[in-house]
């Protein structure tokens, strides 16, 4: 191609415009004819060795072509018209009708191709109407930029409306053609996405113009095609080549949007398969979602079950082929399996871009209301006050804590506050109080199912003011209260009776780990912290944890004050206290015992404090959340495990991996893995090796495991000899422990600060164990001082555990009656506060007598014990210093 002289180009265009009407009358396309003539003139000028096309060349070549076009009609055309009379060599002015039609077409293209898609884009970013009703067309800012390219490209092309601008555009004209092709591909993709609702969109226009949202891509697509036709005609006014072929611009843009949609399309197809009974199907679906699935779409489906109404999701997602749609439970399971994080531990999803409103703030309800799981956090429900009071009686080896919580609800509906609380090791809830109309009301204690049924009847159905506390696995309770009124508050208190830990019987030390949240459905503002105030008969040796440390004030008793985080992400503070060596024996009397009965408490020392199991099975969770604790865990297992111990390790991946000996130093953690199959295999090996203990190191297990029936069978035939020592890294629920709570199989290690050696010490049987027995008559020693009544409550908790042992065929009813008498929350009992006496009577419950509930004020027996035990404690402290 050679360049054109400006005069030659002007001459060619003038002749072409003068003969356009004649060509149209012959049924030919003038633009195609002019393109062919122009190419012919260029080729002949190049063959003659000319550097550019001159006006003379145009006259020489064009006149014969014009004559031949008039003499040779097009095929199937009417007879040739006589030659037109000579015309004025100046360009023909368009008629009034042509001007009106051209301007009207341009105006419609500006409206439908520029202003409408731009307005719909801004409206959807601000309001999110399509995302709420059909599907989210703008899931990311990248999608917003691609959509904005459509009106921008159309506007640039329409701006090239005059010949002068086309000539001035130069190489820019080529880029305008490419952008137009991309706009065609983008508009075609979204027009196809809305194709299922397009027939109804026309009718929806009358409803506040909402139908323009699904119609906008189709109208923009038609406008872009019309603009491309104008660009092809305009190229005759410049030397720029024609616009690039559609498959070079439109097709790549279409495929790019489709690839961006793939992570969203695989979710509805594979999320239901993550819960499939077939392990192979589960593993394949989990692998696909981890590689291709969208975390954001999964998180949204954890809250919403509405199926997106776009073409590709319905067709490729499986809905048109009879596939089962993903339920909320499927999405929650898939989200954990893919990310390794429970959906409730992640902030609720937000509509992207400028829209700002929370999806959870739409018309959703609380699906876990009245259930036995904490579930997701609810916006507007906050912990407004938190205080922890306590009394430590180191002489009796006990402590009593009262945790007072107040919740505030700023959401537009009544809400239920739920929290999973980790108790101090061996602790038991012995008091529950709820403030009703400003007055504290004590709880009634009864059977587990009895109290839950009363709570659901009064709270969920009658929407009154109860609170329920039940166990949720070993050393954990579930607290739930409903309804927290709109713009109102609800206040409750939980009393906990705790035995002091003796981690190492060779040391004159006891430990107390404070309770903490491990999961909650409410938020705690940064300024809200738990105010801790403890009184102790002895000054603590060490206090760890808290936000700014703890302050110890001398006095009688000693005061320990500080602040602790009120969120489940924080670890629990703990105290080390002096313990007399040897610890004195203690008697405890209570009105609920017989007239001549008492509880004797002693501390049993281990026979072989340095002993270690001959064989040990280790199960390591392969979930992603374990990666942060890998260094600590491997140091514990590699540096401190005795070499003579037989060890076999299971890495709990989706399919468990077995390793003879210690675990590999490098472990690949991914997603959220079901630890049930690995525990079953470890239990089978342990049963073959003399019921060797199992050490289970894991992160949160928020989902039920379908593989535990085999583990139950092994535990039943072990007759209580099989033990799983567990340690959880980080907060979160442990549904596996809750599923197996009735077997007393899983025993959490009383770890204080996650030191590597601490786990080994606990496995070496170094700790002392409190022993409590009921004596009567002459069997009661007369030289043993009387201590706290909490010793008797802890004896009752142990007796309830013995009576409800799964190896016993009878005793459960006796255990429930004992829990009701001693007012304890155990695996067979719960505590519930109702609003009226009629509600208690209707459910066969009786609220606790306030005179029998424990309190912070020291008991008379404790004061007497202080006088006797103080010299022993003082002597122990002096020996420690020396």
For each predicted feature, which ranges?
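Membrane-anchoring hydrophobic segments
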Residues: 83-182
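Membrane-embedded alpha-helical segments of integral membrane proteins
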Residues: 175-233
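Internal/C-terminal transmembrane anchor helices
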Residues: 241-269
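Asparagine-centered strand-capping/turn motif at beta-strand->loop junctions
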Residues: 392, 406-413, 421-423
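An acidic, Ser/Thr-enriched
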Residues: 431-473, 480-485, 491, 495-616, ...
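…and closely analogous acidic/polar surface helices at protein-protein or active-site interfaces
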Residues: 613-651, 667-675
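VWA/integrin I-like adhesion module and closely mimicked acidic/polar interface patches used
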Residues: 632, 666-673, 677, 700-765, ...
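A cross-kingdom C-terminal cell-surface attachment/processing module
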Residues: 862-879
């Amino acid at each position: 191609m050679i360049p054109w002289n400006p005069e030659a180009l002007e001459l060619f265009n003038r002749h072409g415009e003068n003969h356009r009407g004649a060509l149209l009358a012959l049924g030919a396309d003038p633009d195609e004819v002019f393109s062919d003539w122009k190419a012919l003139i260029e080729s002949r000028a190049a063959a003659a060795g000319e550097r550019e096309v001159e006006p003379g060349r145009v006259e020489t070549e064009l006149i014969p072509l014009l004559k031949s076009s008039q003499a040779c009609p097009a095929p199937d055309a009417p007879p040739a018209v006589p030659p037109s009379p000579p015309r004025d060599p100046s360009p023909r002015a368009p008629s009034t009708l042509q001007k009106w039609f051209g301007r009207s077409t341009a105006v419609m293209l500006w409206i439908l191709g520029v202003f409408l898609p731009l307005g719909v884009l801004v409206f959807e970013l601000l309001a999110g109407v399509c995302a709420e009703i059909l599907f989210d067309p703008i899931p990311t800012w990248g999608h917003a930029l691609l959509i904005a390219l459509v009106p921008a490209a159309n506007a640039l092309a329409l701006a090239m409306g005059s010949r002068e601008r086309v000539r001035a555009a130069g190489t820019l004209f080529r880029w305008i053609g490419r952008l137009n092709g991309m706009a065609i591909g983008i508009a075609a993709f979204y027009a196809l996405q809305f194709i299922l609702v397009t027939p109804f969109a026309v009718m929806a226009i009358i409803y506040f113009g909402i139908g323009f949202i699904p119609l906008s891509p189709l109208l923009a697509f038609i406008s872009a095609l019309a603009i491309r036709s104008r660009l092809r005609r305009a190229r005759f006014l410049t030397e720029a080549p024609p616009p690039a072929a559609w498959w070079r611009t439109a097709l790549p843009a279409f495929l790019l949007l489709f690839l961006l949609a793939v992570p969203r399309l695989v979710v509805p197809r594979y999320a239901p398969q993550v819960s499939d009974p077939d392990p192979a199907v589960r593993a394949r679906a989990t692998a696909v979602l981890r590689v291709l699935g969208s975390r954001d779409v999964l998180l949204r489906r954890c809250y919403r079950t509405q199926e997106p109404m776009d073409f590709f999701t319905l067709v490729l997602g499986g809905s048109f082929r009879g596939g089962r749609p993903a339920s909320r439970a499927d999405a929650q399971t898939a989200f954990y399996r893919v990310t390794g994080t429970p959906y409730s531990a992640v902030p609720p999803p937000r509509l992207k871009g400028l829209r700002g409103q929370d999806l959870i703030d739409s018309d959703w309800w609380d699906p876990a209301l009245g259930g036995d799981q904490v579930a997701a956090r609810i916006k507007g429900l906050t912990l407004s006050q938190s205080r922890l009071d306590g009394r430590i009686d180191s002489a009796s080896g006990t402590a009593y804590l009262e945790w007072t919580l107040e919740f505030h609800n700023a959401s537009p509906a009544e809400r239920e506050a739920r929290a999973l609380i980790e108790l101090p090791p061996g602790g038991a809830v012995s008091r529950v109080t709820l403030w009703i109309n400003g007055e504290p009301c004590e709880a009634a204690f009864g059977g587990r199912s009895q109290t839950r049924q009363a709570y659901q009847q009064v709270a969920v159905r009658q929407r009154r003011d109860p609170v329920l506390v039940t166990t949720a696995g070993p050393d954990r309770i579930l607290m739930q209260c409903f309804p927290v009124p709109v713009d109102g508050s609800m206040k409750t208190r939980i009393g906990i009776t705790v035995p002091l830990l003796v981690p190492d019987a060779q040391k004159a030390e006891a430990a107390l780990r404070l309770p903490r949240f491990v999961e909650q459905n409410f938020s705690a503002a940064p300024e809200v912290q738990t105010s801790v105030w403890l009184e102790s008969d002895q000054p603590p040796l060490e206090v760890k944890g808290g936000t700014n440390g703890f302050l110890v004030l001398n006095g009688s008793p000693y005061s320990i004050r500080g602040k602790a985080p009120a969120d489940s992400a924080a670890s629990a503070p703990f105290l080390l206290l002096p313990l007399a060596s040897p610890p004195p024996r203690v008697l405890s009397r209570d009105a609920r015992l017989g007239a001549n009965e008492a509880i004797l408490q002693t501390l049993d020392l281990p026979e072989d404090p340095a002993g270690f199991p001959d064989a040990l099975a280790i199960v390591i969770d392969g979930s992603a959340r374990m990666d942060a604790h890998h260094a600590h865990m491997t140091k514990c297992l590699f540096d401190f495990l005795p070499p003579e111990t037989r060890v076999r390790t299971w890495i709990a991946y989706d399919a468990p991996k077995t390793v003879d000996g210690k675990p590999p130093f490098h472990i690949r953690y991914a997603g959220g893995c079901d630890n049930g199959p690995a525990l079953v295999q470890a239990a089978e090996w342990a049963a073959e090796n003399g019921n060797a203990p199992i050490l289970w190191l894991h992160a949160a297990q928020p989902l039920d495991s379908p593989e535990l029936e085999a583990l139950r069978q092994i535990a039943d035939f072990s007759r209580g000899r099989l033990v799983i020592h567990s340690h959880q890294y980080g907060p979160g629920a442990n549904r596996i422990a809750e599923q197996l709570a009735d077997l007393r199989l899983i025993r959490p290690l009383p770890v204080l600060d996650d030191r590597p050696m601490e786990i080994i010490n606990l496995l070496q049987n170094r700790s002392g164990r409190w022993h409590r027995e009921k004596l009567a008559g002459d069997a009661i020693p007369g030289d043993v001082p009387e201590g706290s009544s909490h010793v008797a409550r802890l004896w009752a908790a142990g007796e309830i555990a013995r009576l409800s042992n799964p190896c016993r065929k009878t005793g459960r009813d006796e255990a429930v009656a004992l829990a009701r008498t001693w007012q304890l929350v155990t695996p067979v009992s719960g505590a519930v506060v109702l609003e009226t006496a009629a509600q208690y009577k209707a459910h066969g419950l009786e609220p606790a007598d306030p005179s029998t509930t424990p309190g912070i004020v020291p008991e008379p027996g404790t004061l007497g014990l202080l006088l006797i035990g103080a010299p022993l404690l003082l002597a122990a402290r002096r020996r420690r210093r020396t």
